[in-house]
């Protein structure tokens, strides 16, 4: 699948696909150490820092 980048909105970190707006459901950004992880259902996709 495509890569996602993290974006902050309303004091919360969220993942959004490139060239598209942030989505509220299905995708979440979980900060881990120095990197962020994009989680979609049971799949995990790595993304840039938040």
UniProtKB/Swiss-Prot annotation:
GO molecular function, one term: DNA binding
Positions of disulphide bridges: 7-15, 39-47
UniProt keyword Disulfide bond present: yes
Family: Belongs to the protamine P1 family.
Assembly: Cross-linked by interchain disulfide bonds around the DNA-helix.
Function: Protamines substitute for histones in the chromatin of sperm during the haploid phase of spermatogenesis. They compact sperm DNA into a highly condensed, stable and inactive complex.
The protein's name: Sperm protamine P1
Gene, per the UniProt record: PRM1
